Amino acid sequence: MKEVYLVGYARGASGQSDEPPGSMDHQASVQRLSGEYFSLGNPSDGEALYETAAGENTLSEHTSGEHTSVEHASAEHSSTEHTSGEHASGEHTSGERATGEHTSSEHATSEHTSGEQPSGEQPSGEKSSGEQPSGEKSSGEQPSGEKSLGEQPSGEQSSGEKSSAEQTSGEQAVAEKPSGEHAVAEKPSGEQAVAERPSGEQAVAEKPLGEQAVAERPSGEQASIEKASSEQASAEQASAEQASSEQASGEKPLGEQPSGIPPSSTFSGPILNCHTCSYMNDQGKCLRGEGVCSTQNSQQCMLKKIFEGGKLQFMVQGCENMCPSMNLFSHGTRMQIICCRNQSFCNKI
C-alpha cells in the first residue's frame, strides 16, 4: 500500500501522467498487477512499471481475445468432430455413442480448464504472454486428443465387430445345439429299438412292419411316435394272445370229442356217468356210438338235437365242458343244445 501510494504521489507531483490523476481504476489495476510481484525502489521505477503494466495489460487483453477466438474456433472444430464422432458412433451401438460423448465432454472440460489457466495468470503480463504459446500448444495438441477421440470409434468398431463375431459364433453354437438335440432325440430311437426287440421276439411278423414304420417316419418324431406305436403294438399283441388263449381253452367246435381242462367259471358238480350216443333217432333209440362217459371236473352231459326242414333228424349225447342251452342255425339246419345237469341221461324229447 505504501509503495502504491508513493507511485501515485510521484505521478501527481511530476505532472507527466497520461491519464487524469483522479482515476482510481488505473491505481487499482496497478495495485493488482504490481502489488504481489514487484517491489518499487523509487518513483521513477514505479512510473515505468505503471506504463509497462498498462501496455502489457492491453496486450494481455488482446492476447486473451485472440485466445478466446482460438478457443471458439477449436470449440467449433471439436463440435464438428463431435458431430462426426456421433455420426460414426451412430453406425455402431448406443453404448459406444455414449462413450464417445463422454470422451468429448471430458475433452471440452480440458479445453475449458486450459482456457481458464492463461486468464488466471493474466495479472503478470509478461508471464501470460510467455505462457500463451504453451496455451496455444495445448490448443494445438487438442487435435491429437480429438484424433484419439476420432480413433476411438474405430476401436469401438473393432470391439463391436468382435462382439458381433462372438454373437455369430454364439448363434453358430445355438445352431449346432439343435443338432446335439437331434442326436439326443435320436437316442430314444435306439432305446426304442431295444423296446421293439421284445415285441419282435413276441411276434416276428410284426418286426419288419415296425422297422418299415421307423424308416417312413421323420427322425425328429421317431422317438415319441414309434415308442407309442411299439407300446400299442405290444399291448394289442398281448390282448390278441390273451384272446387266442381264451379261445383255445374256451369253446370248442360242437363235436363229440371230449376236450381238456375247462375254465374255472363253469359249473362244477358231482362226477356222473353220462350215456353217450353218436347217432340217436328221433325216437330216442341209439343207433351207433353208444357208451358211457364220466363228467370229470366241470364236464356235463349234453344232448344235441339236429333239425332239418323243421323236422328232427337225429340226436347226439355226450360229455362236454361248456353247455349253454341255445339254438344254432346254419343253412336251414337248426341244432338245439340241452344241458342235463346232474343227470346221466338227458334224452327228453
UniProtKB/Swiss-Prot annotation:
GO terms for cellular component: acrosomal vesicle. Keywords: Cytoplasmic vesicle, Glycoprotein, Repeat, Signal. This is Sperm acrosomal protein FSA-ACR.1. Residues 1-265 are annotated as: Disordered. Residues 1-8 form the signal peptide. Transmembrane segments: none annotated. It comes from Vulpes vulpes. CDD domains: TFP_LU_ECD_SP10_like (cd23628).
